[in-house]
Amino acid sequence: MEYLKIFSEVKSRSINSKQKGKKGELELVRKLKEYGYNCRRTNQFCGNTGQADDVIGLDYIHIECKRVEKLNIDEAIEQAKRDSKDDKFPTVFHRKNRKDWLVTMPLDSWIKLYNEYYSSMKLAERENADESK
């Protein structure tokens, strides 16, 4: 009898955890849509998408979404690295109550993104300089 009670509590926590995860993912989707990105939550538990991302819609970015008060960021980053495809940057989008969303990613991925940003800014500067001649 005690076993059934413990099993029921564990199952309840598991379902509650999935519901909280879904809620956080939907919240992140709404936030990304505010920025103009057509993002959506994946059905990662159905097994029919073939995707491990929690949220899709940002090309080349693997999104691991965590909406928790206490986050083990090292474990979350390792999960993102493990689940991301070779052509995607592993990222963890995370938020606590009454705080802004944050994005954490490995430094080498950030450097690659920054190099692309820097190159595009320099190209725009050259184009603007050429137009003003």
Q: Predicted segment positions?
A:
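Catalytic phosphate/metal-binding cores of nucleic-acid and nucleotide-processing enzymes, i.e., regions
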Residues: M1-K133
